[in-house]
């Protein structure tokens, strides 16, 4: 059975991937974002209009990568990216999306506009390093996601959730969760329809060290697998 990680374990594994196994951030981000886009296609292939909400960190980078691949898969993604970073990696990811004619919104639509204009929301705002409370600049988007009737797909962690203890009062309730590397403890509280595992890049020795039991879940060349 796949093991669920504490917040500190997730941080430690990430650091080992970078420092011991010499993965680069953009390597892992590309693999993670690709696996997310494939999982989304598997569950929502009949939809077209997708809004990808990106935060300022690695989770947001995963969202930008996913948006690019979703475009290639025939979807019509738009991106809401309220707090951009000046790091070259994120600037390049943004440039790639713009070069593929992916629209970037200046403001988050209200819940009614969201229902009229989009069929799926990809939540790539906060990752496993998140600690409450939500910062003021993200309160508006979190309120909209909480009220929206459009199904939400959360990447790794449903934004605003405690990484180990799950959903706060009035938190978002995603229809889909894509856990990356390995599920975090909050995934035990996920009650949506689809739970996928993505990010197939963990070396066997690292998997054994943390007793993750993840690589056996995958088959063939799949880079994501349904857990629920």
Swiss-Prot record:
EC annotation from Swiss-Prot or TrEMBL: 5.1.99.6
Keywords recorded for this protein, A-Z: Isomerase, Metal-binding, NAD, NADP, Nucleotide-binding, Potassium
Q: What protein name applies here?
A: NAD(P)H-hydrate epimerase
Q: What does this protein do?
A: Catalyzes the epimerization of the S- and R-forms of NAD(P)HX, a damaged form of NAD(P)H that is a result of enzymatic or heat-dependent hydration. This is a prerequisite for the S-specific NAD(P)H-hydrate dehydratase to allow the repair of both epimers of NAD(P)HX.
UniProt domain YjeF N-terminal: residue ranges: 10-214
What reaction gets catalysed by this protein? (6R)-NADHX = (6S)-NADHX; (6R)-NADPHX = (6S)-NADPHX
GO CC term (a single one): mitochondrion
Q: Which family does it belong to?
A: Belongs to the NnrE/AIBP family.
Enumerate the transmembrane spans.
none
Give the required cofactors. Answer: K(+)
UniProt xrefs under Pfam families: YjeF_N (PF03853)
């Amino acid at each position: 059975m796949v093991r669920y990680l504490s917040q500190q374990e997730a941080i430690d594994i990430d650091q080992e991937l970078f420092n011991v196994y010499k993965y680069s951030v953009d390597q892992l981000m590309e693999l993670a974002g690709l696996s997310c886009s494939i999982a989304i296609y598997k569950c929502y292939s009949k939809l077209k209009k997708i809004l990808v909400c990106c935060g300022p960190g690695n989770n947001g980078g995963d969202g930008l990568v996913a948006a690019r691949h979703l475009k290639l898969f025939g979807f019509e993604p738009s991106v809401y990216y309220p707090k951009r970073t000046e790091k070259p990696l994120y600037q390049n990811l943004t440039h790639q999306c713009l070069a593929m004619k992916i629209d970037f919104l200046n403001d988050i639509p209200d819940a009614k506009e969201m229902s009229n204009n989009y069929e799926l929301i990809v939540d790539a705002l906060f990752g496993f390093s998140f600690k409450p409370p939500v910062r003021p600049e993200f309160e508006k988007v979190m309120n909209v996601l909480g009220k929206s009737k459009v199904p939400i797909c959360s990447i790794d962690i449903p934004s605003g959730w405690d990484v180990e203890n799950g959903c706060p009062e009035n938190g978002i309730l995603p229809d889909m969760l894509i856990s990356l590397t390995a599920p975090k403890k909050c995934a035990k509280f996920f009650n949506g329809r689809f739970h996928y595992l993505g990010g197939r890049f963990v070396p066997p020795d690292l998997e054994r060290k943390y007793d993750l039991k993840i690589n056996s879940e995958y088959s063939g060349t799949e880079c994501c697998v349904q857990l629920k």
